[in-house]
């Protein structure tokens, strides 16, 4: 008995003929790498944060729902209120300059527009999405997590 050749498989045809789209890569994140507030002597490396823990001798970017600095929304960087970190923020003032260097090397320049020395910890208005570029700088006022925070709101210059 001679073997018969296997018939070719049919060419698949789409059930619905949709135009083919080629997925594009999502925009690359360009996180903050360094924050400086020259008038206060603050100069810190910035690392990704979890929104709970602040690393020692570094500042952290708050995760979603916040955007990264330079993305056109509200972003937050936080650090401990100690010497060598955000401790000097106790002397923050409207008009002080904030410089952020992104991982790509791009530099962003802000100025503090609002300063709150005793922001109530249960007032979450700053945790809402912003409608324009803002950089929030946050630190504690004591070791008690229920005590007020220092909040400085900076905007691009």
Q: Where are the language model's segments positioned?
A:
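Solvent-exposed, non-transmembrane regions of membrane-associated and secreted proteins
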Residues: 1-157
């Amino acid at each position: 008995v001679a073997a018969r050749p296997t018939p070719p498989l049919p060419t698949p045809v789409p059930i619905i003929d949709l135009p083919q789209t080629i997925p594009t890569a999502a925009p690359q994140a360009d996180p903050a790498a360094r924050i400086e507030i020259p008038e206060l002597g603050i100069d810190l490396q910035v690392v990704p944060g979890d929104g709970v823990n602040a690393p020692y001798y570094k500042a952290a970017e708050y995760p979603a729902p916040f955007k990264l600095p330079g993305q056109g929304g509200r972003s937050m960087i936080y650090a401990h209120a100690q010497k060598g970190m955000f401790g000097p923020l106790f002397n923050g003032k409207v008009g002080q300059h904030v410089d952020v260097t992104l991982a790509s090397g791009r530099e962003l320049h802000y100025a503090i527009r609002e300063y709150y020395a005793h922001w109530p910890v249960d007032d979450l208005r700053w945790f809402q999405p912003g409608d324009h570029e803002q950089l929030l700088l946050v630190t504690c006022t004591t070791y008690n997590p229920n005590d007020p925070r220092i909040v400085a709101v900076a905007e691009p210059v």
